[in-house]
């Protein structure tokens, strides 16, 4: 029996030619960084450096930083990726040349209607949407939404008290996840869920479905390996965002909008109502107002961008407070002095709390939820002697930046004092970027910080937190997607004192 098939010469030539063409297709972009004199790991045909992500993106970035220095080039599939850590180059990319060259984030795969979301929209569409949404996140509007969020802070306290009374260790991911879900759905859609006690509510189930992300899913790999298939996926209505979930939110927004217009509920202050008001404002030209599809996309992206980030950040903060009891005590002292006898928090007092701000900032330094900031280069450009070709994705590796011992002495240590008034002014603003910076920074930054601080004040007014045998020490991270604890943070919750158990009526 012959081991080699007896093909004709023409067949062998065709087969050999096909293999050569496939190899060229899978590697033709791989000489870019070598030509530019930029070091980096050797790519694997088709995959680039993607397979090296198996230990997590932060670990990959750290290894590259140690080996190649302040700048390196690599490939995700065939996409050129340039990592930068020099503050001056970061400033140029994120701020100085944002509008002219580095306006857009990378669109990774087919998005469907989500390409209209503020986080994903490009160029003029992004500018228009940002202009329309910015008024919803002013300090005045946040102050108006504060009572709504305050209700969910009270709900968080009640849920924690129930668990504390049982004497069992508490899964903080469940608690903070429910709080985050309730705040986001309450402010983005105006619905009141109590998701901890109603886990099968359609809003809860679809929101969690929206957040499921598997980096090595076959669909994700097909996007990396064969990006030319993206238009085909778009035509077939196959997107990274589950169709059933997007359809649910589309119908929900339509129904809520119709109900509010019918009942003339124009005085609500949630994000959805603010967007509806912008559609009907006489101050906005019709061609500039948000379309209904854009309205759905913004409401949905609020969940995608706000749920996991808030709940994980709260988990990290409470873990650090638990393992640093002197910091927890000092923060409780500031809270008690600012709001005596468990008084209801106020927006104005909350934003003035210095030590609370220090604790939140230091946690975001150690655990940046988005491990990277990305911008796509729109045209060939030279920055500080570095040539960046059109189409290159320029990224800022936040774990590297936030844990560089040259910038942060003993970066693995939790030290809120790094962000004290005396020290804060000495921090280069382009080496601490938990929410990005420049015109395309996170629009919801102040909203997220307000949610986090309000939750911390309410729970630390009422409880202290201690480690238990189920607490993972040291904490390990899951870093394949957004940064979060590998295992849920589980702690012992101890009610504080016998002072008034305030359940403020924010409304």
Swiss-Prot record:
Q: Where in the cell is it found?
A: Endoplasmic reticulum membrane; Microsome membrane
> Can you state which reaction this protein catalyses?
an organic molecule + reduced [NADPH--hemoprotein reductase] + O2 = an alcohol + oxidized [NADPH--hemoprotein reductase] + H2O + H(+)
What is the protein's membrane topology class? Answer: Peripheral membrane protein
Cellular-component GO terms for this entry: endoplasmic reticulum membrane
Q: Which cofactor does it need?
A: heme
Q: Which GO terms describe its biological process?
A: oxidative demethylation; steroid metabolic process
Q: Which UniProt keywords apply?
A: Endoplasmic reticulum, Heme, Iron, Membrane, Metal-binding, Microsome, Monooxygenase, Oxidoreductase
Q: Which InterPro entries match?
A: Cyt_P450, Cyt_P450_CS, Cyt_P450_E_CYP3A, Cyt_P450_E_grp-II, Cyt_P450_sf, Cytochrome_P450_3A
Range of residues in the leader sequence: none
Enumerate the Pfam families for this protein.
Answer: p450 (PF00067)
Q: Which PROSITE patterns match?
A: CYTOCHROME_P450
- Annotated EC: 1.14.14.1
To which protein family does this belong? Belongs to the cytochrome P450 family.
Q: What is this protein called?
A: Cytochrome P450 3A28
